[in-house]
Amino acid sequence: MHNDFNLLILSGPSGAGKSTLTKYLQEKIPKTHFSLSTTTRKPREGEVDGLHYNFVSEEEFKQGIEKGQFLEWAIVHNHYYGTSKIPVEKALKEGKIVIFDIDVQGHEILKKHYPNACSVFISTKNQEILKERLLLRGTDSKETIEKRLINAYKEMQCLESFDYLIINEDLEKSKEIILSIAKTLVHRLKAFNFEKICKAWKNETL
């Protein structure tokens, strides 16, 4: 397995702002790879297959499970979601920072595969703000939104398993915080080859 210190997991309720912050990181840090999730749900307005998600049928997804193509997968709101293995391993080999936008279930599984991954939980200040955002998004029925709020509260119970928490109340401030977290990944001491660094320092070639 390749260096897993370059993994950044963003998780939290739908509507908290994970996608916005992920896009911001991709704009600010050139050497990144966004792990595109595969899902069986229908595309929302404006979503493009291969850009926002890999949209597949339930049959195709189940075939992927049988073939061991996913690092993790889960059923969320009656739809399958999963993280493909090969693109992630390729990006790590190339030394890129790999960014995940996944739910709490996926976070728990990924941390078993990549224990050194850095994880950030992103949330709103309270459930009323989250509800307002979901209503404004206009992609879910009121019944679905209520289910999302119930699920969001369950996810909040898992906060202790994350490294960082961002209350996304001020978007510009949240952008600053997530960027500072991402930048620290390339300087985490455990990610370096100490023997190589020491030899290079002694030979004055570093």
Curated annotation (Swiss-Prot):
Instruction: Spell out the subcellular localization from the entry.
Output: Cytoplasm
Cysteine disulfide partners in this protein:
none
Is Transferase included in the keywords of this UniProt record? Answer: yes
Q: Which reaction equation describes what this protein catalyses? A: GMP + ATP = GDP + ADP
Reported EC number(s) for this entry are: 2.7.4.8
In which residues is ATP bound? 12-19
- Using the record's annotation, list all stretches that form the Guanylate kinase-like domain: 5-183
Show the InterPro entries listed in the entry.
GK/Ca_channel_bsu, Guanylate_kin-like_dom, Guanylate_kinase, Guanylate_kinase_CS, P-loop_NTPase
Q: Mind naming one GO cellular-component term on file for this protein?
A: cytosol
What SUPFAM superfamilies would the database entry show?
P-loop containing nucleoside triphosphate hydrolases
**GO MF terms, alphabetically ordered:** ATP binding; guanylate kinase activity
Which Gene3D superfamilies does this one have? Guanylate Kinase phosphate binding domain, P-loop containing nucleotide triphosphate hydrolases
Keyword list, A-Z: ATP-binding, Cytoplasm, Kinase, Nucleotide-binding, Transferase
Tell me the function of this protein.
Essential for recycling GMP and indirectly, cGMP.
Q: Which family does it belong to?
A: Belongs to the guanylate kinase family.
UniProt cross-references to NCBIfam families, sorted A to Z:
guanyl_kin (TIGR03263)
List the protein's name: Guanylate kinase
